């Protein structure tokens, strides 16, 4: 009996991208109404855990920041600090109209006109507030985008 040595045809890049796209650990950063929908997305009906999405309370354990709600000028430095404390590789998902562009409070002097003015954003979930299904879809799209991006780059 002769064993062939080519039974493992998986590159290191594919292995790393597969592991990363299946284990998002988002930081809970809820600021307004969208935070309620983010909490709603964690119940058993949607079951984020089966996709490896486990919410974390500290930025050092997270690799995804979900900005859910209105970002005010006073909250902007805290958001930037949390982004800087999150370990690389990290991704940002902006959830809701207020986080995307100011939303209903766009013309207020105290509101940042989108969290992309403070930190780089990888995925946007529109609507006010987006449903749990929309957040679920956004996370799945981010996982697909991550798989494509890592396959294009060479890790080793």
Swiss-Prot record:
Cofactor note: Binds 1 [4Fe-4S] cluster.
Localization per record: Mitochondrion
Enzyme class: translocase
Classification via SUPFAM superfamilies: HydA/Nqo6-like (SSF56770)
PROSITE patterns: COMPLEX1_20K (PS01150)
GO cellular component, one term: mitochondrion
Keywords in alphabetical order: 4Fe-4S, Electron transport, Iron, Iron-sulfur, Metal-binding, Mitochondrion, NAD, Oxidoreductase, Respiratory chain, Translocase, Transport
GO molecular-function term, one example from the UniProt record: 4 iron, 4 sulfur cluster binding
Binding sites annotated in the UniProt record for [4Fe-4S] cluster: 33-34, 98, 128
EC number: 7.1.1.2
Pfam families on file: Oxidored_q6 (PF01058)
InterPro entries: NADH_UbQ_OxRdtase-like_20kDa (IPR006137), NADH_UQ_OxRdtase_20Kd_su (IPR006138)
Source organism, top-level taxon: Eukaryota
Reactions the enzyme catalyzes: a ubiquinone + NADH + 5 H(+)(in) = a ubiquinol + NAD(+) + 4 H(+)(out)
Cofactor needs: [4Fe-4S] cluster
PANTHER family referenced in this protein's UniProt entry, alphabetically: NADH DEHYDROGENASE (PTHR11995), NADH DEHYDROGENASE [UBIQUINONE] IRON-SULFUR PROTEIN 7, MITOCHONDRIAL (PTHR11995:SF14)
HAMAP family named among the record's database cross-references: NDH1_NuoB (MF_01356)
Family assignment from sequence similarity: Belongs to the complex I 20 kDa subunit family.
Protein name (record): NADH-ubiquinone oxidoreductase 20 kDa subunit
Annotated organism of origin: Paramecium tetraurelia
């Amino acid at each position: 009996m002769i064993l062939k040595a080519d039974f493992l045809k998986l590159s290191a890049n594919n292995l790393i991208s597969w592991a990363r796209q299946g284990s998002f650990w988002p930081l809970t950063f809820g600021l307004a109404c969208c935070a309620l929908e983010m909490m709603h997305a964690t119940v058993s009906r949607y079951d984020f855990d089966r996709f490896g999405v486990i919410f974390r309370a500290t930025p050092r354990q997270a690799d995804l920041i979900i900005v859910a709600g209105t970002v005010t000028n006073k909250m902007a430095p805290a958001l930037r600090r949390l982004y800087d404390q999150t370990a690389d590789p990290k991704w940002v998902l902006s959830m809701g109209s207020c986080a995307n562009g100011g939303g209903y409070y766009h013309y207020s002097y105290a509101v940042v006109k989108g969290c992309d003015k403070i930190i780089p954003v990888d995925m946007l979930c529109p609507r006010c507030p987006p449903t749990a299904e929309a957040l679920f879809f956004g996370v799945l799209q981010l996982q697909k985008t991550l798989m494509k991006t890592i396959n294009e780059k060479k890790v080793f």
